[in-house]
Amino acid sequence: MPARRKYAVRDKWKLKKWYEVIAPPVFGNIVIGTTPADDPLKLIGRVMETTLYDITGDITQVHVRLYFQIIDVKENKAITRFKGHELSRDYIKSLIRRKSSKIQGIFNVVTKDGYHLRLTIIALTSYRCKTSQKRAIRKIMEEYVKERVPQLTLDELIHEMVFGKMSAVIAERARKIYPIRKVEVYKSKLLMIPTPEGPKPAVVISPLQLGR
């Protein structure tokens, strides 16, 4: 019986085909990995993780984790959409210092081309600050993202988040309130996508699951 199972598993793997996973145009449509499937429809909805370093080759960006979701398969290529990003926990821990303050803001935003996202931004001060100063810094975060994001397409927003432009502007403004050591867009998540019928949840489900 165990031998039969062994051969069954082996035969199942023989039926599988490998597909190249393609990053969205904002990341140059490069191949970010490969994934197997015995039916291309089973790939739809699968989430792939990589780092910004794997895309750019810049070792200083190894802490930026990127998530892409497969939305289509064409021949041997799995086409993806940006799902979100997150900075590694080890990197965030390395930024935290004793006798300093951490300010966090979570904001829901909508891009110029109709994509809804949730952004988590953190600011780390050089020294411990007062509650009123924390509130003022959080307000600067909110005012900036609410002012800036509606001017950007999704691709432009992704670029400003992961390459540090957004955090640099917030840090510059926040330093007028209190000495700031670091600002990071710690996390982003795609919530809604635009469709002809209006915004819809950014949920990707395989047609095979829909048919069950």
From Swiss-Prot:
The keyword Ribosomal protein applies. One of its GO terms (molecular function) is structural constituent of ribosome. Keywords: Ribonucleoprotein, Ribosomal protein. Pfam families: Ribosomal_S3Ae (PF01015). InterPro entries: Ribosomal_eS1 (IPR001593), Ribosomal_eS1_arc (IPR030838), Ribosomal_eS1_CS (IPR018281). GO terms for cellular component: ribonucleoprotein complex; ribosome. It comes from the Archaea. One of its GO terms (biological process) is translation. Belongs to the eukaryotic ribosomal protein eS1 family. This is Small ribosomal subunit protein eS1. The gene is rps3ae.
